[in-house]
Amino acid sequence: ASRGQALEGYSPLAEVELTASTDLTVPVQKFTAIPEGAQQLACYQDGALITSLIYTIPAEKRARLGEKLYSFGSVSDVHIPTNDGDDFRRALAFFKEYGCSFVGISGDIANDGSEAQLQMYQKIIAPYEESMPVYVSAGNHDAQGGGLNRTQWEKYTGHPQQFMVEEPSSGDIFIFLGDNNWPNSSNNQTVLTMAQINWLAEQLEKYKDRRVYLYQHVFLADTCGDVYDAAGNPVYGVWFRPDRAEENAYRDLMRKYNNVTWFSGHSHWKFHLQSNNDALNVFDGDGEYCQMVHNPSLTVPRDYIDGKRIEDSANSEGYIVDVYKDYTILRGYDFENGQYYAYATYA
């Protein structure tokens, strides 16, 4: 809040049931950032401010970020032709109006990897080709049915399966690493090949003194990107498995290079489900790993209700990322209702 008014354009930080004379603790994810302009924490009931429940944020805790260097949009799991691509069009228009320099997508632009779907993707991004490039890493849906068709992929996305881009104003490095195959039922059908991982290792070593943003679709087990049930069991399967050599090699790179911020996707889980698993959206294993960020789905975010996975094609989620000299600020965004999620704003 600011001066007793809810911060414009943001969701509540939390919604809780208060009982008189009872203490209540509201957990906050450790990477949570105080939005710029916020001066207070305030409680509201039915839209009305409770004046006895206002906390002034100390001046030294308020956001002082300095000059913004650039911004980019970050989304995942577009799954064209879901919703006829309208969610994708709306997101790109929003990113353009916001002033994003480019957009990163962490996989699954096509629902079944067909040429027709890739053609539709190309048509949607065409108006932004010069002013706001769209970069994408292939996901499992893009690579199904015999593996990624690299010729078609490069033709319609404009980029190879793996590539890097340097942001000119900062020297920051963006690496995009595409999935190799789906399904992954044998040793010859791997999410990533060892050749890809060796290429990635070369890039990370080369740019170890730079800020690096990595896009790769499938998250690692027991890190970020998944929701857990009450017994602590994962409810979304991941075949990038710890019993595979390529997974181990990739995981070691995520441990070694803490200058990396890795954007994954794949599970579609909504931002709010971090209430089930604190590590769902952002995770670093208390410093064991680089910073890992999970992008929810732009077109079919998934909810988890009464132990069941629910597809919600009426919603649409992603990130605005603002980059400063000393900070990267991620703000989860609700494209359907046009607001930032205060509980999914991270540094």
Describe the residue ranges of each PLM region:
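N-terminal active-site segment of His-dependent metallophosphoesterases
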Residues: 56-119
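A short C-terminal boundary segment appended to hydrolase-like catalytic domains
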Residues: 60-66, 310-347
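Extracellular recognition modules
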Residues: 40-44
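Active-site-proximal segments of metal-dependent phosphoesterases and phosphodiesterases across multiple
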Residues: 189-191, 207-264
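Surface-exposed, short loops/turns at beta-strand junctions within beta-sandwich domains
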Residues: 30-37
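Extended active-site neighborhood of metal-dependent phosphoesterases/phosphodiesterases
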Residues: 115-207, 237, 249-256, 272-300, ...
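Aromatic sugar-binding surface patches on proteins
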Residues: 10-29
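Active-site neighborhood of phospho(di)ester-bond hydrolases with catalytic His/Asp-centered motifs
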Residues: 74-76, 102-108, 133-140, 177, ...
